[in-house]
Amino acid sequence: MKELEKYNTCLKRIDEFSQNLGIKKKDRTIFKMKQSENENEKCLVLENGSFDSPEPWFVIDENDEIHTLLSLQSLKNILESLKQSQKENFELRLEKAIYQQIPVDFNDVWTVAMDEIKQKAQNGTMEVSIDLEKLISKIKQEHPNLFVDMQAMIERVNQNERL
């Protein structure tokens, strides 16, 4: 009885995960992993679905842990998608850091920043670990002509008020 409850709990977890992925109950593949006569071998028994069903396939082991099976192509697609999302996130953070410093020409600052980032990457620094605000502040100090000088603007406004 306890075995059946554990198995049903696993099925509920698979149901929830399948729904998040948009996989219908009839389209999901579930295997039950069983010990074979040889201690170095496990046997996968098809409990639900078919070998033609969409991925991922679910495997319930002897400890009622749920595992998934993916093709190498699916794993590659997932990793490439994550990499693309990470790149877009990095670029948005860089864009925000540049705009916060009020550039005269955004593209010029972007080019200088990307050169700095590429140089850091060649020296072994991971892009995601670069403090972008700090990098843009450094660029602003080294290339002040690329940014609006707010202090000078305020001084000019104050001078004009005195006249």
Swiss-Prot record:
It comes from the Bacteria. Belongs to the UPF0763 family. This is UPF0763 protein CJJ81176_1011.
